[in-house]
């Protein structure tokens, strides 16, 4: 059996944290359900039978999620994410209303919380047995005498679903609040108003000019391949990711699955004029002629979401002359809120930049969630 709580949760409980009948405070139970709704992108269904539904989720920690996660034994990159198990049941003794469930939530196989909550779900647009969930109207309830052990559950280990953001990008115009944004990478923005990612995407026809097998079309990723130094470093190697889609703390994702990829000297040293050190042939998808250096503009100060490639990059030729950009080959696209949340919840860099919303989730239409 699993330990029911850790000493770090003392402030979460009404009364003593060691009491067998302890319950979350009203403030804590509301914080928990808001965190599970807003800071977790997707639930993976592990088991479903007439008695119980079991879901698993993985997300980079936010301040809300961190309140409920136990202290990590080691400060590794996986210690920055929460591994969550959710058990939904409908005990007759609780006389629950329709769509109400008794819910046990475990964090990192160590801390467990009990509540009654209204649950609404809808299929997630990527993969099978994946769901987006909204948790509402929570009520704290005492822990049951028999607490399930997540380690005893048969967790699927196959990684059978991958995210290619190009498949979910739709043509867009700069939003009305185009200045209300933060820069995630060159040509990639988080819209604070829409809670969604916008980015400049290369036309699919230009893939023919890229290295064999290349799929990524985001501007930041292309610039990274063009400008990153050959010997590489941790920033170049696309580390520090988890995999919320497959509910695993370690990710084997490729750059096209996350839009954080960018020239490493821009990210870690804030350099804006960079020498071409990577795949020099990629200049053909960005500029009308060969370039020796690339200047990144309009990124850190007064950023705005723009559809114009020339607002973001300047090519400099071998004699110091400016090289025109291939503006026709790039279009502004947007990801919907669910896909944007999935990317952010799996990336340590983006989670730090994109603050989780503090507002309670309201479905855009009554039929959005079942």
Swiss-Prot record:
Pfam family, one: Herpes_UL16
Subcellular location: Virion tegument; Host cytoplasm; Host nucleus
Keywords: Host cytoplasm, Host nucleus, Late protein, Virion, Virion tegument
Chief subcellular location: virion
HAMAP family: HSV_CEP2
Similarity remark: Belongs to the herpesviridae cytoplasmic envelopment protein 2 family.
Assembly mode: Interacts with cytoplasmic envelopment protein 3 and with the capsid.
Descriptive protein name: Cytoplasmic envelopment protein 2
